[in-house]
A protein has these predicted regions:
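N-terminal Sec-pathway targeting helices
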Residues: 1-17
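Generic detector of bulky aromatic hydrophobic side chains
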Residues: 7, 20, 24-27, 188, ...
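General helical structural elements
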Residues: 6-7, 60, 146
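Alpha-helical interaction segments
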Residues: 6-8, 43, 178-179
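Extracytosolic and intramembrane catalytic regions of membrane-associated proteins
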Residues: 73-199
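Generic preference for well-ordered secondary structure
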Residues: 9, 33, 44-47, 168, ...
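N-terminal export/targeting and maturation segments
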Residues: 20-118
Length: 199
């Protein structure tokens, strides 16, 4: 009986060790790998965007080409969502009512392109109430990048003529006060945040 008891206790201790020590380490390592993969993908996107801007130079063409770039590189399934002012909606009338010529141009260019494209998840919104504290005079086009089965990051392409001034004034571009932006063209910036809950 004592041997069986010893075997049983040993098995219990092994299980406890596995669930308390091994699994958290494996989960942490998986998260680290997912983050590195997201960083690698985002770096590729940033480099490609810079190359697009160098060859194009036109803002609307730049937007459309960057959408095409993601489609060609990652072959995302179709889904298109619109976030005017950070408020979930898919009603174009709500967006078109915004008194911003650039915003409407971006909306028209992207929606026209999206009819024949396949994008995992895209948003465009005028940044007046969005939860990531972008300047109110900016316009944001967001890509949700799938890293693996349950890991996502988002890559925001931002048009903001006064971005540098907002940074000097102490405005932040994520909820934690971190400046994660990278300038990719005149008045265009990329901000990457991850992981991101997929909704």
């Amino acid at each position: 009986m004592k041997k069986w008891l010893i075997y049983l206790l040993s098995a219990v201790l092994i299980l406890v060790y596995f669930f308390i020590i091994i699994l958290p380490v494996v989960d942490s390592l998986s998260g680290h790998i997912a983050r590195k993969e997201a960083e690698r993908q985002v770096e590729q996107i940033q480099v490609s965007m810079e190359a697009l801007w160098d060859t194009r130079g036109d803002e609307l063409t730049f937007i459309a080409d960057s959408v095409l770039l993601l489609h060609e590189q990652y072959q995302y399934p179709t889904s298109f969502h619109l976030y005017p002012g950070g408020e979930k909606s898919i009603r174009p009338t709500k967006i078109l009512s915004k008194p911003t010529v650039l915003y409407n141009q971006l909306y028209n260019a992207i929606t026209q392109f999206s009819q024949n494209s396949e994008i995992e998840f895209a948003q465009i919104f005028y940044a007046n109430k969005n939860p990531f504290y972008y300047p109110q005079d900016s316009c944001v086009f967001r890509y949700i990048i799938k890293v693996d089965d349950d890991e996502y990051c988002h890559c925001d392409l931002i048009y903001s003529p006064n971005w540098e001034q907002h940074k000097q004034d102490g405005n932040i571009c994520d909820p934690f006060g971190n400046d994660l932006s990278k300038r990719v063209a005149d008045d265009w910036y990329v901000v990457v945040l991850y992981p991101y809950e997929y909704y």
